[in-house]
Design a protein with these regions (language model features):
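Nucleotide/phosphate-binding catalytic cleft detector across ATP-hydrolyzing
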Residues: 1-127, 133-251, 257-300
Length: 300
C-alpha cells in the first residue's frame, strides 16, 4: 500500500493541510485556548476560535505563530500534532510522509514544474510574512522575507480609521474592510463602505463611510515594502534566471495576494507580468503536499 503525502502550511492566521489523493483536508485557525489552572490546552483551531472573546479569566488565548515566526514552541508542537491527526484521520494504515511549507512547494502548488532548469519567481503574501523566492531545479536560488503582510494591512486600516475618523474598530472589521474595499492601486470609480465602531472621544457607537481610495492610502507603506522586496530580489537574480522570469512571469499567492490590484502594483514596479494563482490561500499546502514526490524523483 503506497504511503500518502501530507503538506502543511503552518500559518500565522490559519493552518492548512493537503493530502495526495484527497485534496485539502484541513483549514483551521492557528489558535489555542489554554487553561491556566490545569495547565492544559482546552481547544485548538476552529473550536478555539469560537471561544475567542467568550473565555473566563482562568483561560488564555494563545497564537503561537506571529509574523511567520514560532513564538511558543511547546504550544506549536501540540497544535501541529493535533492538525496532523485531523489530516490523517482514524483510518490511516501507514504513517504518511509529512512536509512543512517550503518555497518550492508554493511554486509546485501553482502548477509550475520546478524540476526544470528555469527560473521561477514566487511571491507568497501570508498573514504574518511576505516571502519572495527564485526557484530553479527544485531549489531556492535567492530569497527574502519581510514581516509585512495581511496582518500588517489590517493594523494599517485600524490605525487609519482611528486617526482620520476618530473611530475604534476591531480586527474582524478591519479584515472585512480590506476584503470589501481594499486596494493597492488607484481606482477610477472608488468603492465605498459603511463602517460601524466606537467613537474615540465619547465611547458611543458611531458610523462612518470609507472609500477604497482611503484604504489605498492607508496600505501604501505596507504594499510598497512588499513591492520593493520583490524588486530587490529581481536585482539579485542571475541574468539567465532573470530572463526566464521575464518570459514566465511572477507567481503571486497567499491570502494577501487577494488584495485588489496587488498584482498590478508589482507588475508596474518590476515591468514583469504578474499572475495571482487560483486558490491563492490553499496553494501553499497543496504544493507542499506534492513536494515530497518531487524530491523523491531527485533522490531516486
Amino acid at each position: 500500500m503506497p504511503t500518502s503525502d501530507i503538506g502543511i502550511d503552518l500559518g500565522t492566521r490559519n493552518s492548512l493541510a493537503y493530502s495526495t489523493g484527497k485534496g485539502l483536508v484541513l483549514n483551521e485557525p492557528s489558535i489555542v485556548v489554554y487553561d491556566k489552572n490545569t495547565e492544559k490546552i482546552r481547544a485548538i483551531g476552529e473550536e478555539a476560535r469560537l471561544m475567542e472573546g467568550r473565555i473566563t479569566s482562568d483561560m488564555e488565548i494563545i497564537r503561537p505563530i506571529r509574523q511567520g515566526v514560532i513564538v511558543d514552541y511547546t504550544v506549536t508542537e501540540k497544535m501541529l500534532k493535533y492538525f496532523i491527526s485531523r489530516a490523517i484521520g482514524r483510518r490511516a494504515f501507514r504513517k504518511p510522509r509529512i512536509s512543512i511549507c517550503v518555497p518550492s512547494g508554493i511554486t509546485i502548488g501553482a502548477g509550475v514544474d520546478v524540476t526544470k532548469p528555469f527560473g521561477n519567481l514566487v511571491v507568497d503574501i501570508g498573514a504574518g510574512t511576505s516571502d519572495v523566492a527564485v526557484i530553479s531545479l527544485a531549489g531556492v536560488v535567492v530569497s527574502a522575507s519581510v514581516k509585512v503582510a495581511g496582518d500588517t494591512f489590517n493594523q494599517a486600516i485600524l490605525n487609519y480609521v482611528r486617526k482620520n475618523h476618530g473611530l475604534f474598530i476591531g480586527e474582524d472589521m478591519a479584515e472585512k474592510i480590506k476584503i470589501q474595499i481594499g486596494t493597492a492601486i488607484e481606482e477610477s470609480n472608488p468603492r465605498t463602505m459603511e463602517v460601524k465602531g466606537r467613537n474615540v472621544i465619547t465611547g458611543l457607537p458611531k458610523t462612518v463611510t470609507l472609500t477604497s481610495e482611503e484604504i489605498r492610502v492607508a496600505l501604501k507603506d505596507a504594499t510598497s515594502q512588499i513591492v520593493e522586496t520583490v524588486h530587490g530580489i529581481l536585482e539579485k537574480t542571475p541574468p539567465e534566471l532573470a530572463a526566464d522570469i521575464v518570459d514566465r512571469g511572477i507567481v503571486l499567492t497567499g491570502g494577501g495576494a487577494l488584495l485588489h490590484g496587488m498584482d498590478t502594483l508589482i507588475e508596474q514596479r518590476t515591468g514583469v507580468s504578474t499572475l495571482t494563482v487560483q486558490d491563492a490561500m490553499s496553494v501553499v499546502a497543496v504544493g507542499t503536499g506534492k513536494y515530497a514526490e518531487v524530491m523523491a524523483r531527485f533522490d531516486g
